[in-house]
Amino acid sequence: MNSELFSPYTIKDVTLKNRIVMSPMCMYSSENEDGQVTNFHLIHYGTRAAGQVGLVMIEATAVLPEGRISNKDLGIWDDSLIEGLHKTTTFIHDNGAKAAIQLAHAGRKAELETDALAPSAIPFNETMKIPVEMSIQQIKNTILAFQQAAVRSKQAGFDVIEIHGAHGYLINEFLSPLSNKRTDEYGGSPEKRYRFLREIIDSINEVWNGPLFVRISANDYHPDGLTVQDYIQYTKWMKEQGVDLIDCSSGAVVPARIDVYPGYQVQYAKHIKEHANIATGAVGLITTGAQAEQILTNNEADLIFIGRELLRNPYFPRIAANELGFELEEPYQYERAPGKISTNK
């Protein structure tokens, strides 16, 4: 039986064997607080590759030490971090998947002893510290850090880079009028609020010619915040700059109530795909093969990002293939366990 979910997908010169992407999820497991990969990361990501995920995207990886969400985040701010990341991509490639990295800066959500940086001195909520408004020089330094991280990503063997522009972290803070109250060239109009991301994309394009994704929060869930309509223009600009795919999440730039239900963010992937004419990834409570297949069949997205379901079961692709009646090519080491895998949890 044919399946959209298990059909290949090519972006530039990178071909994914199927449409399943491991969504980036922080593991907070750099135990020595130095940004280094640990054995846990090798097992964690290698297992999902062996489980037949097409693209394994590692967690938000900080481009600067002060840009970590926590002191146990992975980092890519120094050449000494390349070796561990290269071991990770080797594990992923050896188990049949492509490897992606999400480059990130936590902005005002950095929970470290050092000052948190943000476009404006506005805390996320009343319990978090007031961030320091970034100077122009700090902005330029951060843009350079993203570029240097892209160089290291190439050296570490990653096939895809994703820029983290979602979930209330630094880039998202610049994009949203709720967190960006600047009156200089980086704030005010949508064009000026987009400038920080524009310059990051331009800087990465100077050193990286592989597939480039951007994760966005397509809805601020606030009456004065951004909606998916606002992101149509943003994503059109991203496409003009050569971004290949928009990973469509939502929320977390300010505290907000979100009505969560199966596939609740697919609407954003569909809307941006249709109106910005760019490839999209759907993410958020996608938990079955049938659900993922329908999203692709309905042309609502091009890739399916699976998060918590892959934490629950690293062999989700095998279960999805059985569910869809698709014969998945298994690693030879698993051939002694033929037959259908139970979908019971």
Curated annotation (Swiss-Prot):
Pfam families: Oxidored_FMN (PF00724). Disulfide bonds: none annotated. Its EC number is 1.6.99.1. The keyword Metal-binding does not apply. InterPro entries: Aldolase_TIM, NADPH_DH_bac, OxRdtase_FMN_N, YqjM-like. It is an enzyme of class 1 (oxidoreductase). CDD domains: OYE_YqiM_FMN. FMN binds at S23, P24, M25, C26, A60, Q102, R215, G307, R308. It catalyses: A + NADPH + H(+) = AH2 + NADP(+). Belongs to the NADH:flavin oxidoreductase/NADH oxidase family. NamA subfamily. This is NADPH dehydrogenase. The lineage of its organism: Bacteria, Bacillati, Bacillota, Bacilli, Bacillales. The gene is namA.
